[in-house]
């Protein structure tokens, strides 16, 4: 058992119906990182460029959210098929209303039970999503099932110390409000980090780690 497995799993229903009922909260977080990350980074482009694309792959972006990976992915696989999957209907609705980038197909999909056939994808993108999945090993087993032999899982996450300073300040304030541990800010991302993720991945995948070091710096 890794230390991360002892952290409480998030409530899937609450995530879908509250935290990700629409795309506004996630859009704000993405824009915050775009404005204040030092050094600046186009994260989708950076992550996608860690892999050598042929140009004709079938790719699932699970937890697609605002669809920020779809357009840059299309640039890299002009002849490929792209599926943007998300458990949150509200996110898919907002994405469709704003126009789906990359001519992608949208799919209501649970990472723990992917509605896709065995060996149907060449690559799966899971960016900042695996720590939200209640049963991480099950989700990774599903990814392994859906991937073709030689396929790739691009699992993007943060380090364990992600925004530690801000987390301490926020949790001190929450403690004064007598909130429960369930509401402590910053706990969920620690379930699958750069450090703890290897223990989850190595049973089914050959793992290569790529690091991008940055910080949020506010004026």
Predicted regions located by residue number:
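Class I SAM-dependent methyltransferase SAM/SAH-binding core
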Residues: 58-113
């Amino acid at each position: 058992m890794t230390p991360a497995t002892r952290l409480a799993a998030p409530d899937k229903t609450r995530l879908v119906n509250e935290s990700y009922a629409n795309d506004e909260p996630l859009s704000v977080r993405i824009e915050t990182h775009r404005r204040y990350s030092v050094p600046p980074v186009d994260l989708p482009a950076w992550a996608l460029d860690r892999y050598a694309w042929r140009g004709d792959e079938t790719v699932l972006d699970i937890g697609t959210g605002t669809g920020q990976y779809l357009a840059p992915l299309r640039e890299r696989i002009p002849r490929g098929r792209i599926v943007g999957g998300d458990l949150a209907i509200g996110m898919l609705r907002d994405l469709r209303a704003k126009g789906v980038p990359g001519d992608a197909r949208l799919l209501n999909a649970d990472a723990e039970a992917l509605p896709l056939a065995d060996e149907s994808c060449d690559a799966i993108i899971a960016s900042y999503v695996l720590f939200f999945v209640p049963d991480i090993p099950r989700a990774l087993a599903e990814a392994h099932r859906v991937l073709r032999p030689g396929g790739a899982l691009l699992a993007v996450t943060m380090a364990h110390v992600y925004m530690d300073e801000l987390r301490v300040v926020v949790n001190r304030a929450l403690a004064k409000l007598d909130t429960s541990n369930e509401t402590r800010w910053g706990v969920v991302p620690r379930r699958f980090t750069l450090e703890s993720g290897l223990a989850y991945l190595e049973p089914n995948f050959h793992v290569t780690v790529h690091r991008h070091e940055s910080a949020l710096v506010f004026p």
